[in-house]
Amino acid sequence: LPSGRGFRIETSDGVVTADHVVAATGPFQTPVIPPVVPDGVINQIHSCHYRNPEQLEDGGVLVVGAGSSGSQIADELLRSGRDVWLSVGPHDRPPRSYRGKDFVWWLGVLGKWQMKTPPAGREHVTIAVSGAYGGKTVDFRRFADRGMTLLGMTQGFEDGVISVAGDLAQNVAEGDANHLGLLAEADAYVEANGLDLPLEEEAKIIGPDPDCIVNPLCRLDLAEAGITNIIWATGYRQT
């Protein structure tokens, strides 16, 4: 402000003044859609613009990206009765809760918040965790058991056909390893600190691979599959 004290902020809902401003914009600023499928070929939106199944065209949905946004959107679409394909890349898959404690609590006591930022050039994988429906651990095998088709990473597009990487089984297995690794760290912490927390052995059960993992698709013909929408849950870049 001209007085030198306070700030004048222009917002989408008008102008406000304040003595202090906290800039908590985080890294989620500019949505990123990879230049894979040309505009106009099919209805495409970024996950930041997704609100509910009713806003989409009738028909099946391909969700690209299986982090927290992609996995929760795919789950909601499946619950709504849509045919859903989910393109799964490398990811971490922490438990939503374990032994009566939320995963955020575990990340704190296990020192995960103090881990150093990965150096430039090292792959940073997404985290698949859900707060929907009371908060549940994301399990891609269970998605498939309910009728969702899992795919590897989306690689390209030509003549109406999506090309798919052959990395689905590896990505799911590495997510499982991350899940079990965090449970093991949590168990060790409980024992070392003499905590009285309930056992939760069922959290360590990994189900059998569904057919879409055993016999993964390497191509997906959108028209043949009845897919009329693509949701890109592919993250953001900082601006």
Residue ranges and their predicted role:
Residues 1-239:
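Flavin (primarily FAD) cofactor-binding/catalytic cores of flavoenzymes
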